[in-house]
């Protein structure tokens, strides 16, 4: 850190050395974790693709399968699941699915150390990608799973019951199975 600051100061005193100082900053600065840029780019792409599968893909597909009077209901269910499951994933789902459980055999859920993403920072990495990206990538699958189930009960379930079922599904079924 001090070496980088020294290089920056010296290069700024040289007349017209703005570009070399920027190059020096780019060369000597490094992230605190070893990130694989190709892997990170692919994870970003895959995250966007899975999110687009849910909204608008799955919601419009289900809207085409129901009667005209229920199109808005199915669209709203898919959009509400996306928002609610995302929030639930950040609050507790990620911690249940990917929290560390030490060496205790037989633990079916992770510890609660990552509630509200408490121990997830910009500097943390998981498998060569930033952990924040890993959280988002896994969240898209936590979102699309209950959205796929909507097709089974389209036109037959109340909105509030659908949200309660989706929350229970994510916390009691999806997240523990991810942890195994």
Per-region residue spans from a language model:
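N-terminal secretory signal peptides that target proteins for export/translocation
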Residues: 1-14
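Hydrophobic alpha-helical transmembrane bundles of multi-pass membrane proteins
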Residues: 11-180
């Amino acid at each position: 850190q001090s070496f980088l600051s020294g290089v920056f100061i010296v290069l700024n005193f040289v007349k017209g050395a703005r570009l070399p100082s920027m190059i020096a900053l780019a060369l000597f600065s490094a992230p605190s974790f070893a990130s694989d840029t190709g892997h990170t780019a692919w994870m970003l792409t895959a995250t966007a693709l899975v999110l687009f599968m849910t909204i608008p893909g799955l919601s419009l597909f289900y809207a085409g399968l129901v009667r005209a009077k229920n199109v808005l209901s199915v669209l709203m269910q898919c959009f509400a699941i996306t928002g609610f499951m995302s929030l639930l994933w950040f609050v507790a789902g990620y911690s249940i699915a990917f929290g560390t459980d030490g060496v205790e055999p037989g633990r079916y859920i992770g510890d609660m150390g990552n509630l509200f993403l408490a121990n997830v920072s910009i500097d943390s990495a998981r498998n060569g990608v930033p952990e924040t990206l890993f959280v988002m990538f896994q969240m898209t699958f936590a979102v699309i799973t209950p959205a796929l189930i909507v097709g089974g009960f389209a036109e037959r379930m109340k909105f509030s019951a659908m949200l309660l079922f989706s929350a229970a599904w994510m916390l009691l079924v999806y997240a523990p199975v991810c942890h195994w």
